[in-house]
Amino acid sequence: MIPNLLKNWTIERYWNGSVVVRGEIYNDTKNRFPDGTNIRTSSVQYIDFVAGVVRTLNSIYHLEEREVYRK
């Protein structure tokens, strides 16, 4: 079981330069959300796409790997 797993995630950048991630959370370690709840993170401090990790001020999330479709 992967903690704080975000599925079907997207990255959003706001006019002020802040970046957030939206997605469905599973295995929330702080028990804030039931599995499958759509959330928006607080401002992202760090993203590692290779490791699939997002860090905000108070949380670490794991990004579910997505397939890349190429034509």
Report each predicted region and the residues it spans.
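Generic structural signal for short, solvent-exposed loop/turn connectors between secondary structure elements
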Residues: M1, N16-G17, I47-G52
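Terminal low-complexity, poorly structured segments
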Residues: M1-I2, S59
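N-terminal acidic leader/helix
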Residues: I2-R32
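Generic serine detector
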Residues: S18, S42-S43, S59
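Acidic, low-complexity, intrinsically disordered interaction modules
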Residues: E24-R55
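Short, compact, well-ordered microdomains
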Residues: Y46-K71
